[in-house]
Structures are given as structure tokens and as C-alpha cells.
């Protein structure tokens, strides 16, 4: 049980960060186990509502990979991946858009239920996320998979100015009107850049970047961009962590102040990063 004095200490510690980030925009990529566990869902939504109440402007971009795979399985559609990207034919794209739409409204309802004000958006709304067709690394056609070509920040700014928390599903649209499934990390990075966000936070299912993946005590709390190629070469950064780090680097190179990879399995991980001296996870910074 935390004593009253300890509670007071927590509030005092948070005060300078509330002052620092008041009026600033923080983009959060919401995904992984934090989307599957009911208690973690509530913790994340509570964090977002609290941030808004103290003057910070959170913007949420959510994933939905496990839920999409589950729905495809129930419909008898096999999930296929090439270079980590979901092969998305026309029937799969319909399922992707349906599942992401359902998840989007569930997130909005949770935020509203906790006293916040939230609006759900698809990347297709007001051409929020413009996209072109993306091919795999070996130039295979993987269907309706897209890459971001542009973001309409005015829509998000209007929603934010009216006091709402935007929740964005990672679906984009081309100039020809084609709908594309886009990696949520990439969308979050592009939105952070377009909004000139102060922070980009990516929630994952790992503690952050570890020197030794078997030892949680080897967490790298801060990593400079100039060190990332060496860490990839050594195998410290590998697999699914590589594209997340690349999204962080892209955001920093295009004007986002700091980027963070956090363990979404930790309750209130966002608040721990934003409002405490120590923070958690790995912060990726410029050279």
C-alpha cells in the first residue's frame, strides 16, 4: 500500500512534466498485448484521459494484427505473410477494414466511458492518410498493402482543438481511390511528423531494446541514432524491432523531438514514461 506521503511525492514528481508537455502533442501507437488484456486496455485509456485533462494532446494510432488474423481464421481465409507484411487481397482487405473499424470504435467507447472525449477516424476520412501501393523487399506483389505518401494534419488539429482525442485506424487511400492496409507504426510516425509532435511512443510486447534479450537488466534506456546500425549488425536489434526503430528514426529525422519504445504489458506505461524522472523503455534520440 502506498502511503499518503509517497502519493504526494508521485504528484510532485509529475508536476514539472505536466508543465513541460502542456499544450504539446504526443502520438501513441497502441498495439500488442495492451490491446488484448482488459486491465491493460483500461490502464492505457486512463493514461490518455489523464493526459488530456492536464493539457496534453494525445493522438492514438492503433494496430489490430492478432484480431485480423483471428477473424480471417474464423472466415476460413488463410493468413499469409511476406517479409513480415500481411498479403492483402481484396477479400482480406475487406476483413482488415471491418476489424480495424470495430476496434477503433471499441477504443473510442472506452475513452468516453472513462470521462474523456474521443473521435474515431479511418485514414480514409478527409484523405487523412494518403497512400501508394507497397511491394515486399524482394519486389513481390502483396496486394492492398500501402505506404504513406501524405497526411492531412488539419483534420487532426481540428479534432484536437475541439477537445477530443483522435483515434486513427491505419487504413489509407490512394489518389485513385484504392484502400490500403498500412503498418500502424509507419502511420504513427507519419502522423507524429505531420503534427510536429513532441513525442512518438510505440507500445510493444518487450521491455525495449535489450543488449541481451534473455536478461531484462540489460535494457538500453537511451540509444543514439548513430549507434543503431551497429546494434543491428550485432543482432541486438533484430526481427520485428528493426522496423519499429526505423519508424523512430524517421520521425526524429523529420522533426519529432523524442521517440520511445515502451513495454505495453506494464500497466500505465505511458504515464510512467511521460511523468516520471526515470521513465521506462528505450528512448531513441538524435545524434
From Swiss-Prot:
> What is known about what this protein does?
Catalyzes the ATP-dependent phosphorylation of N-acetyl-L-glutamate.
Query: Where can this protein be found?
Result: Cytoplasm
Where is substrate annotated to bind? Answer: 64-65, 86, 181
Name the reaction it catalyses: N-acetyl-L-glutamate + ATP = N-acetyl-L-glutamyl 5-phosphate + ADP
Can you provide one Gene Ontology molecular function annotated for this UniProt record?
ATP binding
What residue ranges are annotated as transmembrane?
A: none
Checking InterPro entries in the record gives: AceGlu_kinase-like_sf (IPR036393), AcgluKinase_fam (IPR004662), ArgB (IPR037528), Asp/Glu/Uridylate_kinase (IPR001048), Glu/AcGlu_kinase (IPR001057), NAGK-C (IPR041727)
Identify the metabolic or biological route this protein is part of. Answer: Amino-acid biosynthesis; L-arginine biosynthesis; N(2)-acetyl-L-ornithine from L-glutamate: step 2/4
* HAMAP family listed in its UniProt record: ArgB
Q: Which organism is it from?
A: Desulforamulus reducens (strain ATCC BAA-1160 / DSM 100696 / MI-1)
Coiled-coil regions listed in the entry: none
One matching Pfam family: AA_kinase
In which family does this protein belong, per the annotation? Belongs to the acetylglutamate kinase family. ArgB subfamily.
| Protein name as annotated | Acetylglutamate kinase
Top EC category: transferase
Amino acid at each position: 500500500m502506498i502511503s499518503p506521503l509517497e502519493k504526494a511525492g508521485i504528484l510532485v514528481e509529475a508536476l514539472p512534466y505536466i508543465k513541460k508537455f502542456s499544450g504539446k502533442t504526443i502520438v501513441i501507437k497502441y498495439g500488442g498485448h495492451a490491446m488484448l488484456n482488459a486491465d491493460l486496455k483500461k490502464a492505457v485509456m486512463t493514461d490518455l484521459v489523464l493526459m488530456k485533462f492536464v493539457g496534453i494532446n494525445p493522438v492514438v494510432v492503433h494496430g489490430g494484427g492478432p484480431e485480423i488474423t483471428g477473424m480471417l481464421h474464423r472466415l476460413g481465409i488463410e493468413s499469409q505473410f511476406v517479409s513480415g507484411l500481411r498479403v492483402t487481397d481484396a477479400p482480406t482487405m475487406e476483413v482488415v477494414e471491418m476489424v480495424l473499424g470495430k476496434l477503433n470504435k471499441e477504443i473510442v467507447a472506452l475513452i468516453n466511458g472513462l470521462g474523456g472525449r474521443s473521435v474515431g477516424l479511418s485514414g480514409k476520412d478527409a484523405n487523412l492518410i494518403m497512400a501508394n501501393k507497397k511491394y515486399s523487399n524482394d519486389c513481390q506483389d502483396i496486394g492492398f498493402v500501402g505506404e504513406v505518401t501524405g497526411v492531412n494534419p488539419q483534420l487532426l488539429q481540428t479534432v484536437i482543438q475541439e477537445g477530443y482525442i483522435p483515434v486513427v485506424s491505419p487504413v489509407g487511400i490512394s489518389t485513385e481511390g484504392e484502400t490500403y492496409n498500412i503498418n500502424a507504426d509507419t502511420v504513427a510516425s507519419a502522423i507524429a511528423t505531420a503534427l510536429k509532435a513532441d513525442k512518438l511512443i510505440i507500445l510493444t510486447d518487450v521491455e525495449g531494446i535489450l543488449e541481451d534479450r534473455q536478461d531484462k537488466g540489460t535494457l538500453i534506456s537511451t540509444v543514439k541514432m548513430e549507434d543503431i546500425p551497429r546494434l543491428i549488425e550485432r543482432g541486438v536489434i533484430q526481427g520485428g524491432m528493426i522496423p519499429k526503430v526505423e519508424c523512430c528514426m524517421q520521425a526524429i529525422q523529420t522533426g519529432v523531438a523524442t521517440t520511445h519504445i515502451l513495454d505495453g504489458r506494464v500497466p500505465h506505461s505511458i504515464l510512467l514514461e511521460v511523468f516520471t524522472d526515470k521513465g521506462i523503455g528505450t528512448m531513441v534520440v538524435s545524434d
